[in-house]
Amino acid sequence: MINVNCLNNIAACGLKLFSDEYNTESSFEDAQAVLVRSAKMHDMELSDNLLAIARAGAGVNNIPLDKCAEEGIVVFNTPGANANAVKEQVIAAMLLASRDLIGGNKWVADNAEDPDIAKATEKAKKAFAGQEIKGKKLGVIGLGAIGQLVANAAIALGMEVYGYDPYVSVKAAWNLSSEVKYISDVKDIYKECNYITVHVPALDSTKGCLLYTSPSPRDTERSR
C-alpha cells in the first residue's frame, strides 16, 4: 500500500483515479507521496518516508525545492490543469476594471427602495458606464498554458494583443493567434498597453520583471 497525503482539498473525481494500492487518507507523517495546492511547505518537517510531492497547479514556490533536492524527493507540477479557469478570471478582472460592475451593483442595492429609482438611475448611470475593452491594447507577459489562452480570448473580444516571453515554446507559439504581436522588450508592453496581465512563475530570474509607471495601466496578476 502506498500512502498519499492531501495537504489541501483535492476533488473526489481526481482521487478516484488512484488504484486500490493507494491510500489517499494517510497522515502527513506516514505519507510516501503528498498532493498539495496552496499549502506552504517551507517550514514543514519532511519525513524520511516521503518520496514525491505533486502540486495541483503550475507554480511550485510553496514547496521547498532545495530541501527536496537534498533529500531526493521528486517534485511534480501540473501546468495547464487550471489554465482555462484562470483565463476566465483574467477576462473577468479586465471587465471589472473597465466597468464598475461591483460599484453599480452596490448602488442598486443601496437605492432599491428609492421611490424615484428610475430618475435616480438615469442620473447616476453615467458614473458606471466605464469603457469598452474592444480596441484596447492588452499586454500578456508569459505565454505559457494560461497566457496563450488569455491572448487568444482577448483577440476574440476585439482587443489588440502584445505578447512577451523570452522562453516561449514552439508548442505555445503554434497555439497563439497569428494576430498576437510579439514584443522582444518587456518595457514596450508598459509603453503600449492599456491592460497588462502577468503569467510567470515566481523564480529568481523573474524577480523585478514588473515595472510600475505613472499613469499605470490596469494590471491583472495571476502568477505563481
Regions found by a protein language model. Give the residues of each.
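Rossmann-like adenosine-cofactor binding region
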Residues: 39-45, 166-214, 218
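Short gly/ser/thr-rich secondary-structure transition/capping motifs
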Residues: 17-22, 34-37, 115-124, 175-183, ...
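An N-terminal-biased, well-structured beta-alpha scaffold segment characteristic
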Residues: 1-78, 191, 198, 211
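Phosphate-binding beta-alpha-beta segment of Rossmann-like dinucleotide-binding domains, i.e.
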Residues: 79-137
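Glycine-rich Rossmann-fold phosphate-binding loop(s) that bind the pyrophosphate
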Residues: 143
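Aromatic pocket-lining residues of Rossmann-like dinucleotide-binding sites
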Residues: 154
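Hydrophobic/small residue at the entry helix of a nucleotide-binding pocket
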Residues: 146
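Conserved beta-strand positions in the Rossmann-like core of class I SAM-dependent methyltransferases
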Residues: 162
